[in-house]
Structure formats: C-alpha cells, structure tokens
Amino acid sequence: MIPQPKSIIRGNGFVHVTEPEPASFIDASLPREGYVLDVGSSEDGVVRVTGGSSEGIFYGVQTFRQLLPPKSLRHSGSASEGPWQVPVQRITDAPRFAWRGVMLDVARHFMPLPDLLRFIDLAAFHKLNVLHLHLTDDQGWRLPVDKWPHLTEVACWRKRTMLGAVHHDKYEERPHGGFYSKQDLQEVVSFAAKRHITVVPEIDMPGHMQAAIAAYPELGNGARVDVMEAWGISTHVLNLSDKTLGFCRDVLDAAHDIFPGQYIGIGGDECPHDEWKASPDVQARMKRLGLPNESSLHGWFVGQMADHLRSLGRRAYGWDEILAGGERTPADILIAAWRGIEPTKIAAQRGFEVVACPDVAAYLDFRQSEDKDEPTPVGTVLTVNDVYAFEPVPAGLTEDERKKVIGAQANVWTEHMESARRVDYMTYPRLCAFAEVAWGKSPDESSIENFNDRLKIHTARLDALGVNYRQLSGPQPWDARPDALGKPKTKEARIAKQAKFIADLQ
C-alpha cells in the first residue's frame, strides 16, 4: 500500500467482500485524520472503518480500496465488481503532517476542467489534502475578476509558445490559453472538498505579472508588452501605484469569493527590481514611505496584501523570498520554502509556519534520470528514490521550531507539460513517493527497498486508474521531445545557485 499505514496487525483467513466501501463510524477520540480499518478481525467479521472525523473515514476508505484487486478501481464493467477475498487484518493509521500538498501550475499550460478534476481525484487517492493552484503568471491568467474583464479576454491567451527550455527562435506557432469561469472554480472547490482536499489559489504578485500588464498597461512601468511567449522570469512587474494596489485587492477579493479555505497565495517570488529602480514614480513612493531600497518596498507591498487578506479573515501564503522583508514580513504569513533546504530552517527559526517544498526534493518538473529520452530535461535529476528520501523537517531545529514545519508540498511546474498526459508522466510515480513522505513513513517499512517493492505492485493500480505514469524501467521512445530541448543541471550546480539566491535571507 502507498502510503504505507503505521500499523498492520494481520489475522488468519480471508473476508468475503461484496462492496467497495466498508461500514463507517466516527470516534472522536481518534486523531481527526486518523482511522482504524478493521477487516474481519472483530467477532462479527464485519469490515468497518472508524475515523476521528469524516476525513479519517475517507482515508480509511482509500486504504481499503488498495486492499482490493487493482481492477476494482476501474470505473465500470464486470472487472470492477466483486466479490473479493481480502485478508483479515486491523490497520491503525494517522498522518504525520497537517499540510500534504501538491502545487499545479495551470498558468504556463492551461489544464481543462475535466483533467483538473482527475488530477485532484488522483491526489486524494494518495491521501494528499491540499491543492495549491497556481492560477496566474507571466505566460497566462486563469482567474475571472469582474472588475477587470480584460484578464479573461487578453491576459489568458498567448500568441505562441516557446519549445523547450533553451532560449531560441523555435516556437509552437499556435495560440495557447483559456481560463476558468467562476462556476468552473466553484466546481473544483466542491469536487476537492468531497475528497477532503482544500484548494489554495495563488495569484503571483508583484512579479510574474506580465500577462496582467499586457491586458492593462497602466499596471506596469511604461513598457507595452504582450502575454509572455518565452519561458523564464519577466522583468515587467507591477508599478505599485494606488490604482495598482486597488487592482491587487480586487483580485484577492475575487479569489476570496470563490475559494473558502483559510489561505490565499500572493506569490511574492522572483520579482526583478529593474523597472522600480528606473521609475521616478516608484522612487517617489519609496521616499514618501521612508523605505531605503527596493527590497524594502517589496516587503511593504507584501504587508499591504497580507493586511488586506487579514481584513477578509484569511491568511497570506507566499514563497520564501517574502522572508527577505525582515521585520516587515507579517508574522502570520505562511511560507512555502522552495529555494533548497535552508529556507525551511530559516523560516521556522524566525517563528513562521512553513511548508517545505525544496526544489531539490519536490520539484516534479525536474528530469527523472540522465536518459536521453527524458522529455525536455530541466533541473537536476530527481528520481523516485530521491523524492522518497526527502525529510521535510531540517536538522538542527528545536522542538518548538520543528512544530513550525506544518507540512510538505510537491510542485508541478508546467512550462514543459503541454497536456494532462505529460503531467501524468512527470508527476507519477514520484508523487506516490512524496505522498508517503507527507503522510509519514512507517518506521517498520520505510526502507527504499520496501517502498520500491510496494511501488511495483502499486503501478497496477495506476494502470487501472488510467495514469500515464513514467515506467519504472525508464522513458519509452514516444516519451521523448527532441523538438523541445532541455537545460539540465547537476545537483551541485543547482545547490550552488540556490545558495547564492538565498543570500537575501541571511
């Protein structure tokens, strides 16, 4: 099973099962997300799951589904019907972390609603409970905002798309885009909630905003731009005028009205300051505010957005660059620590709650091997075993600091994932390994060898669920993208680069 339960006590014999879901009960003395799955070990021989809440029951049912033959996971047909023989056993289980997340970038490549719902369903099957939805970026905008209609008329489409990770003149000469209606996103929220997944929207600001500036040039610093067609980080950022701050608040209001969860992402990452340094208006604002430099202005902006979300009864969630704001960084902001391992430690030591999602362990756009047929290889090699070895809580923290690490998250950046099929390939089976890390490895069965043995069995479940996962033997010839060149790096080079980047946190 994946994730492996904490305790399995096996009995003698088998239970004859005719229904795919057991009887369910709530016992509030259990952990809220914990459960006990009793498969025929009690005197009455009944299969039952007892959870600390409806969440616990749901996770117990997911475990029970893995006790049935993989064919039972198919949607219909005689192969999906019982009866089945299941070994007698008693399983006791509960997660290690409250936040077990996966981030999906739908800005770089738009994912149609049915594919997005399927992505959620697969995450829930693996007991993940947060979908961080990256809705906006330089290359596309997916969130409707009534007061700013051009966002879903102009900002949601780019004229063409760069092929590969190397900057060159090779493009797919076809427009790409789309957006979700309010009804679409409400369906996403409802669908996820039934599977005990909270959707956390992210609207990246004040950088990663070229698509919005293409739709409303007055938000920028004077340059006339189109929605970005190449990959990378745009130097075109928001200008931080009063009108632009109002735009940002309107966008957060729109997210608040659709997504009921506690957190709303504001990004805060990778914001070049070139335009701010050259802008008389921005420099005048800095002077009025008494701020010494552009980094301080960035921190002030983050504080403005966090204050607005707090007024709505929500908490801001952002990338670890936000920590560079120092004392200006709002104490209640949740940090997504991505630039290597160190930012998780820094955030916790400074008293911030933090979600560990370091690129070197949890970025699923990174290539899966050195094989020449890996599609558009970027980043360092990140194998299934590398993901499984990830420890979200860094060494060297006190007990109180360790508690600040509320969970872990895998990030699926889609610059080079043009379809749901490609997302499957890059996500699975590595997300299976990550799910077990986030749920908490069983002390008795947490070895790489044990996990790999279970993963070989688990691939039959992925087959039944229709997942286009990367084969354990390696990429197949049809997985290659010779038309879309990658930009691979060694792990040493990546770590060195991140060490340079996080100098702003020291």
Residue ranges, per PLM feature:
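Flexible loop/turn segments at secondary-structure boundaries
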Residues: F110-P112, D138-P144, P206-A212, G265, ...
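Residue-level preference for long, well-ordered alpha-helices that form the structural scaffold
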Residues: P112, G177, S181, L240, ...
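Flexible, acidic glycine-rich loops studded with aromatic residues
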Residues: R315-L323, R328-I333, A337-Q506
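Generic secondary-structure signature for well-ordered alpha-helical cores
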Residues: A193-K194, D253-P260, D307, S311-R314, ...
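Feature activates predominantly on carbohydrate-active enzymes
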Residues: S7-G11, L30-Y263, Q304, H308, ...
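Active-site neighborhood of glycoside hydrolase catalytic domains
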Residues: A212-E218, G222-I333, W338-G351
